[in-house]
Amino acid sequence: MGKKIISAIAAVGLLAAGVYLGSQFGSDNSATIVGGADRYAQKSGATSAAVGSLAKSVGASGKGQVHAVRDGESIQAAVQKAQPGDVIQVYPGTYKETVYIDKDDILLSGVIVDGQWPTMEGGQKLNDAVLYSGNSITVENLHITHYKGNAIMGQAGNNFLIRNNRVIDTGVYGIFPQLGKNGLVSNNVLSGIEDAAIYIGMCDNVHVNNNEVFANVAGIEIENSRHSIVENNKVYNNTGGILAFITPGLPIKTTFDVIIRNNFITDNNHPNFGAPGSIVSGVPAGTGIIVMAADEVTIENNIISGNKNVGIVITDHDSFANITKDPDSDPHSDKVSILNNLMFNNGAEPIDDIKALKIASLTSGPVDIISVGTSRDSCLLNPGQYPSLGTKSFGTCGFSTTADTVTYLLPEPVAPREFKLEEKGKMVYYGVCAGCHAYNMRMIGPPVETIQALYMDNPQGIVDYISNPTKKRDDYPAMPKQDYLSPEIRRAAAEFMLNTDSKGVFHDPALNQQK
């Protein structure tokens, strides 16, 4: 998550100084009717299939050989023996390892016996628990704890199913599918994550439901992703609850067609425990939902309460300084629709910038919704239902529910892909490197521009470093080893990184579908 999230909240202070307060923060809403009932049924594979069939096109087949792994044995050794279609059953015990799945159609399933779970234990030494780059992967029934980086990370794998896992204290991210299409994240419990518990990064057609996320810095994030539904989750006691946004400088340039519905988003007031010096360490506590530069986000039928800063913030890239703009990303949050939600007891203890904004706009009492900056063609179903600031330009929504759009999961799995070596290097860059490195702004790792300046025509230098990295700067976390990738793949990814830019091949038309 980038500087945008921090700045978006703090940016309201700029408006408090008097930036078009009269036009932007009046109490009357436009009478314009915005949007129709089919607004979100676009070229996205939306379906009205029964909820019970959500997993039809995702996850492994489980039709092959069963490999049993017991306490004292290696999960990775079983993965290496497995063939597509096989099942790896992990019995209760403690497994201190990183598992990398680079094959298609593998079912990694914990076996729970008399309440005893198989535990993957990082010991605060290992970076990642489970990494997968294969397609049609299932990861389920694992207790994962004490890793430094990620519990479960997808690296350009499609048709993923991540369910029924307990993820506790796993460093930066909990569940992090990156650059995947057609995936379900369901029935997981996540707590104690320094950044985002569930982080959907540069994905399409993802369903996030029935998860419980609490005591994290960020609960659920939809970043540079399209056609996603976040529903029926319990999101509480995080620093911030649910976020939909665009990070500038990534290969995918858009976030749109996101439905946030039927969630409990309550009491997200946890003190921020992000790593000192990290970006998220500056996120203020107390915000239920943040929409930043994302389009076509619908917020419906949620219970949003007890968030001491504000219930919902809608903002854009233009509302604050000190962020590098991406010319290929629209900076505005357009076509945001706030339908019927139950909102109460939000905004009781806002940050100082929001207090200043309320004073400047002659507003008293708590505020549920704040819109900062430009938001075109956005709407409220019932204008005046919620105490709000900055929503005068919002129209009245022309539809009242998204119930007919049950899921954006595809009816059939995405077909397997075959890549040449140079294409594999690009996909590794997109699916692995871009999880921590944007082109020209800081994320978990330094900008790509900085890496290019350091290594220039020396791709082997990058290969050597990522194979056995050492911590060089106090203001960035240590980089994990990438030695699970073959030397040829590491070299191809390094060459791609050194030859990419913010436009050109970095702005990949194949990834940036039109709305």
Regions found by a protein language model. Name each.
Residues 61-89, 94:
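Acidic Gly/Asp/Thr-rich repetitive segments characteristic of extracellular carbohydrate-active
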Residues 69-73, 105-148:
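Right-handed parallel beta-helix/beta-spiral solenoid domain characteristic of secreted/periplasmic
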Residues 109-111, 135-146, 159-172, 181-196, ...:
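Right-handed parallel beta-helix
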Residues 443-452, 468-514:
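Axial heme c-ligation environment in periplasmic c-type cytochrome domains
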